[in-house]
């Protein structure tokens, strides 16, 4: 508000363009002994560009520009994966393979504000503002060799064991330079036991590594907060991971009447990732994705989905 009872008006113009494409394919060959070779590839690209301009609407009907924000990014991803599956013994098979992924982000951000200084046509005729990490190229090369063993112990029990080793290199160039290597070992055990045809017990143990969103590395626009025009990037961001311990029991009601399940699980988080305060002053409010440390989470969950057969409405499910 311009005064106690005097409203002020602003207008924003936010044109943008988006384009994307993806191509992929797979091939599978089965040998005479029953073994299988599979390979696949995926290549995609996402191009985004937006320009945000804000104008003060003056009392006489004219307008005065006070913000120019231009964001352009190109995200490319290329993945290739190959694996070989063979039968070991009766009820057991083993799949071994490797995956390679390349991800590239080119990001550019320009901010112009009304104020004292030399205006620039490339900044909408406003005064250019310096933004840390505004022009950046980020590239990741990741390899994942893996082995997956499936064992049908008997007609009621099965066990899946997988071992994955993830190694990656992330290099950032442009306004900032940073190059880092990450290595993670990701085991998984998934045990299932059909106590009865209706009652199943599942025990799961695994290590989960959450991939970093490349947009968190670079400065970006913030269209949800008028008090903060840009979101800061974090060149030192690390992937977070957690150990997952999960015990699940599921009971299927007779006559396909529904499902009741109980789930108890624990997460042990490391380098947990969320937005953190990186404001430089009380008037320059900023946030960025960051690693906040370790923690534990316990969850007990009960679920039920029941068909309303007793009300002669078998197609209605109450959850």
Where are these regions (language model features)?
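Feature captures outer-membrane beta-barrel proteins of Gram-negative bacteria and organelles
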Residues: 185-193
């Amino acid at each position: 508000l311009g005064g106690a009872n005097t409203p002020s008006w602003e207008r924003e113009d936010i044109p943008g363009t988006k384009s994307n494409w993806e191509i992929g394919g797979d091939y599978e060959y089965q040998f005479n002994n029953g073994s299988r070779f599979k390979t696949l590839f995926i290549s995609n690209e996402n191009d985004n560009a937006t320009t945000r301009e804000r104008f003060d609407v003056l009392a006489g009907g004219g307008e005065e520009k006070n913000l120019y924000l231009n964001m352009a990014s190109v995200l490319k991803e290329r993945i290739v994966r190959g694996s070989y599956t063979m039968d070991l013994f009766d009820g057991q098979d083993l799949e071994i393979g490797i995956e390679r992924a390349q991800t590239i982000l080119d990001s550019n951000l320009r901010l112009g504000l009304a104020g004292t200084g030399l205006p620039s046509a490339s900044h909408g005729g406003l005064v250019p503002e310096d933004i840390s990490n505004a022009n950046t190229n980020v590239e990741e090369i990741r390899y994942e060799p893996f082995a997956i063993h499936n064992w049908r112990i008997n007609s009621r029990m099965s066990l899946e064991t997988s071992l994955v080793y993830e190694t990656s290199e992330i290099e950032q160039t442009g306004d900032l330079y940073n190059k880092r290597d990450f290595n993670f070992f990701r085991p998984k055990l998934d045990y299932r036991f059909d106590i009865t045809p209706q009652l199943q017990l599942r025990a799961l143990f695994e290590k989960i590594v959450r991939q970093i969103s490349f947009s968190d590395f670079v400065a970006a626009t913030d269209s949800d907060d008028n008090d903060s025009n840009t979101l800061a990037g974090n060149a030192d961001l690390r992937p977070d991971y957690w150990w997952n311990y999960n015990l699940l029991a599921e009971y299927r009601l007779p006559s396909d009447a529904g499902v009741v399940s109980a789930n108890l699980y624990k997460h042990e988080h490391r380098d947990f990732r969320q937005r953190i305060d990186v404001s430089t002053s009380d008037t320059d409010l900023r946030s960025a994705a960051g690693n906040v440390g370790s923690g534990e989470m316990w969850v007990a969950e009960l679920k039920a989905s029941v068909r309303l057969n007793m009300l002669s409405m078998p197609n209605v499910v109450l959850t």
